[in-house]
């Protein structure tokens, strides 16, 4: 929905208008586990606030912004369309990123991936441990707020690590297909780990849902 509305060229303007006219509002996805299911690695208070407040705010603000964008399209107001781009990117990215993040985690997670994903990690990073070190370093090294990502470069057929600032969506800003995202905004860890981001990164590996990451990897290879 977001990409068609925002990124369409002039030749796609008429279809986009029709699409927006019948669009459905975004909604907050349910978590596939209880708020306390990831303890002791991520506590219930963090998960509840993160999901029901922070993610919900991105969803609500995205819906409001899309309504304003729809009005601007209908009026042919290009200035207003341009002015709304930052809000679309921020709130749309926040919704996309968190929707991936929740499924990337599991109370039954941790350990190592298996099969083709593990082989691809070894091929592109040397070993699973080297991969963990590189993604951890990229995530810890984000200045301010942002995300660390494992993505897939479809053109090269390779896994790549990237860091995105704020809520910039990985695919929309780098072209990489997102497989695993690590939220390093302070709201993701501060209530439990204070300002020690490396401790949060160390803990989150215990709840990574490798089945979900593998499913994403296999899907983007098709």
UniProtKB/Swiss-Prot annotation:
The main place the protein resides is mitochondrion
Q: Would you name any one GO CC term?
A: mitochondrial matrix
**GO molecular-function terms, A-Z:** manganese ion binding; superoxide dismutase activity
| PTM annotation | Nitrated under oxidative stress. Nitration coupled with oxidation inhibits the catalytic activity.
Which residue positions does N6-acetyllysine occur at?
68, 75, 114, 122, 130, 202
Q: Which Gene3D superfamilies match?
A: Fe,Mn superoxide dismutase (SOD) domain, Iron/manganese superoxide dismutase, C-terminal domain
Keywords of this entry: Acetylation, Manganese, Metal-binding, Mitochondrion, Nitration, Oxidoreductase, Transit peptide, Ubl conjugation
In this UniProt entry, the residues modified to 3'-nitrotyrosine are 58
List the catalytic activities from the record. 2 superoxide + 2 H(+) = H2O2 + O2
Give the cofactor note. Answer: Binds 1 Mn(2+) ion per subunit.
Residues binding Mn(2+), per UniProt = 50, 98, 183, 187
Places the protein is found: Mitochondrion matrix
Classification via Pfam families: Sod_Fe_C, Sod_Fe_N
Q: SUPFAM superfamilies annotated for this entry?
A: Fe,Mn superoxide dismutase (SOD), C-terminal domain, Fe,Mn superoxide dismutase (SOD), N-terminal domain
Q: What is its EC number?
A: 1.15.1.1
Cofactor names from the entry are: Mn(2+)
Q: Where is the transit peptide?
A: 1-24
In the record, N6-succinyllysine modifications are located at: 68, 75, 122, 130
Q: Which InterPro entries match?
A: Fe/Mn_Superoxide_Dismutase (IPR050265), Mn/Fe_SOD (IPR001189), Mn/Fe_SOD_BS (IPR019833), Mn/Fe_SOD_C (IPR019832), Mn/Fe_SOD_N (IPR019831), Mn/Fe_SOD_N_sf (IPR036324), SOD_C_sf (IPR036314)
Please report which protein family the annotation says this sequence is part of.
Answer: Belongs to the iron/manganese superoxide dismutase family.
Quaternary structure annotation from Swiss-Prot or TrEMBL: Homotetramer.
Summarize the protein's role.
Answer: Destroys superoxide anion radicals which are normally produced within the cells and which are toxic to biological systems.
UniProt protein name: Superoxide dismutase [Mn], mitochondrial
The protein's organism comes out as Macaca nemestrina
Gene name per UniProt: SOD2
